[in-house]
């Protein structure tokens, strides 16, 4: 291992960039649909050795060392995000004649921007670099902060945070309930980078022992927590999720709107399976209603005739808000609650819009510079200022998250407290049967664990599921299947944690790692001088 580490450290020029890109790309194997978490041991071990070789030019000063480290981190991130997000380009192929020009932006441009976070993380860690365990702690702390920044800067896009790589199955998800995603990400980097100590020997014993203990605790806590079955309340609701698997190209045709609506009604009216209760609530996916529902009373009447007495439909739909004479209306990506009388008894709008999918960031600036191609990308939705929990006549509430809102742990506001479930409606049909829907589904499962609240996930093409507060699938429909699932909704876990608690733990872990990193770095700097 020492010889291999030495060869990596001494590699120069283009070979270093290629190795960093390859290390990041291999790390994406830890993500769905593969879930091979051990790949990240290779990735971060190689990354540490590459940074070990960032010595800078003699007399070149601080930046001569930081810039090569930034480059290695950027290349690592570029490989990771290209391998993990290439499927985004599939959405542009649905209207290839109009948007094929944007494929390089989706497949290479977005990863190039996201890689900046990892570039800055490695550059920051390099400021505290040493020749032992301290550098592993510095790298973990820096990656934790970079993922925190990625979750909110420029609207935020925390998709495929490193922490998801160490949570492929429920037994490995439970630590997220105790610590939260950011803490898991930080500790995961420490664990995955620790084998690099074998190549340099210094700090190897304590480092590997600590990493081993953390990994054992990760599995052990998961095993312990999964011994508790999810409780089913006496007044538990039965949920039906409708998965019509409407091809996205068909949803975009005006001619098929009536047939699409009829398909949702048909699936909703199917009798429950043998031994199943009649559903109390029915869930349709994001933007299931292919027209403005409030302008179509006949559609509401058809919904009323389909629902049995006491049933409530939650459906994704586009909501239009009239702005008055001379002003264009606003459109919102919404969820309606509709009772068996065809009355809309609740509604909520999407708060966190998808950039370039539901709106174009900096549209005014782009228009001033004459960049019309980007402005022509799909969009046109307005963002709500807050989300409204949906309440049944019985008083039970559901916390709505539309599409990728569920990937943001910070979206879990106090309105989640006391909710019967998180209601997540989405349409992953844009991306086809690629890794995208599977990655999205994993993040929904982790939110259930993190919050201790079950998740009802209705997806047009899948994966639809009812998920218990431990991330286990009570019932599900695979990607691409047409059908329904009926399931009894479990209760939440009794040991709920809040996002504020998780955030406190993250900064505590960050502080401990910084202490571990700073003292060896000071000693290392003195020896070098």
Swiss-Prot record:
Q: Which residues form a coiled coil?
A: none
The answer to keyword RNA-binding applying to this record is no
One annotated GO molecular function is: N-acyltransferase activity
Instruction: Show the InterPro entries listed in the entry.
Output: Apolipo_AcylTrfase, C-N_Hydrolase, C-N_Hydrolase_sf, LNT_N
Q: Which organism is it from?
A: Agrobacterium fabrum (strain C58 / ATCC 33970)
Residue stretches making up the CN hydrolase domain: 242-491
List, alphabetically, the CDD domains matched.
Answer: ALP_N-acyl_transferase
Any one annotated GO CC term:
plasma membrane
Q: What is this protein called?
A: Apolipoprotein N-acyltransferase
PROSITE patterns hit by this protein: CN_HYDROLASE
- Family note: Belongs to the CN hydrolase family. Apolipoprotein N-acyltransferase subfamily.
> Which UniProt key words apply to this protein?
Acyltransferase, Cell inner membrane, Cell membrane, Membrane, Transferase, Transmembrane, Transmembrane helix
Q: How does it sit in the membrane?
A: Multi-pass membrane protein
List the lineage, top down.
Answer: Bacteria, Pseudomonadati, Pseudomonadota, Alphaproteobacteria, Hyphomicrobiales
Places the protein is found: Cell inner membrane
A Pfam entry, by short name: CN_hydrolase
Q: Name one GO biological process term.
A: lipoprotein biosynthetic process
């Amino acid at each position: 291992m020492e010889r291999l580490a030495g060869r990596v450290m001494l590699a120069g020029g283009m070979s270093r960039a290629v190795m960093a890109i390859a290390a990041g790309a291999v790390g994406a194997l830890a993500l769905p649909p593969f879930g091979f978490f051990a790949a990240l041991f290779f990735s971060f071990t190689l990354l540490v050795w590459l940074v070990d070789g960032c010595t800078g030019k003699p007399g070149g000063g601080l930046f001569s060392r930081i810039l090569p480290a930034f480059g290695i981190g950027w290349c690592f991130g570029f490989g990771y995000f290209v391998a993990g997000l290439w499927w985004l380009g599939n959405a542009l192929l649905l209207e290839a004649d109009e948007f094929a020009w944007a494929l390089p932006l989706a497949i290479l441009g977005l990863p190039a921007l996201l890689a900046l976070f990892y570039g800055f993380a490695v550059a920051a860690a390099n400021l505290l670099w040493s020749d032992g365990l301290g550098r592993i702690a510095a790298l973990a702390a820096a990656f934790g902060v970079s993922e925190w920044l990625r979750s909110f800067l420029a609207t935020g896009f925390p998709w495929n945070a490193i922490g998801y790589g160490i949570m492929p199955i429920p037994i490995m998800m439970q630590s997220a309930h105790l610590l939260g995603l950011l803490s898991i990400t930080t500790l995961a980097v420490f664990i995955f980078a620790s084998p690099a100590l074998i190549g340099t020997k210094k700090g190897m014993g304590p480092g590997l022992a600590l990493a081993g203990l953390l990994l054992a605790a990760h599995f052990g806590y998961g095993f312990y927590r999964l011994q508790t079955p999810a409780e089913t309340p006496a007044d538990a609701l039965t949920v039906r999720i409708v998965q019509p698997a409407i091809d996205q190209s068909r949803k975009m045709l005006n001619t098929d709107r009536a047939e699409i609506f009829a398909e949702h009604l048909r699936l909703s009216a199917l009798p429950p399976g043998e031994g199943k209760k009649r559903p109390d609530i029915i869930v349709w996916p994001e933007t299931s209603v292919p027209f403005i529902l409030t302008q179509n009373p006949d559609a509401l009447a058809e919904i009323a005739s389909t629902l049995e007495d006491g049933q409530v439909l939650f459906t994704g739909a586009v909501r239009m808000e009239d702005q008055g004479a001379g002003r264009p209306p606003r459109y919102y990506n919404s969820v309606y609650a509709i009772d068996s009388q065809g009355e809309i008894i609740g509604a909520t709008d999407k708060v966190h819009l998808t950039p370039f999918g539901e709106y174009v960031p900096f549209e005014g600036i782009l228009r001033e510079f004459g960049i019309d191609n980007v402005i022509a990308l799909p969009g046109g939705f307005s963002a709500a200022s807050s989300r409204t929990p949906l309440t049944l006549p019985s008083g039970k509430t559901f916390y709505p998250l539309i599409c990728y809102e569920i990937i943001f742990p910070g979206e879990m506001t106090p309105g989640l407290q006391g909710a019967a479930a998180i209601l997540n409606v989405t349409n992953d049909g844009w991306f086809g049967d690629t890794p995208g829907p599977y990655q999205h589904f994993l993040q929904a499962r982790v939110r259930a664990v993190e919050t201790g609240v079950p998740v009802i996930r209705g997806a047009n093409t899948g994966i639809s599921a009812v998920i218990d507060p431990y991330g286990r699938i009570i019932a599900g429909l695979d990607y691409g299947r047409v059908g329904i699932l009926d399931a009894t909704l479990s209760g939440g876990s009794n040991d709920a944690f809040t996002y504020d608690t998780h955030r406190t733990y993250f900064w505590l872990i960050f502080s401990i790692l910084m202490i571990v990193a700073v003292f060896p770095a000071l000693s290392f700097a003195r020896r070098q001088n």
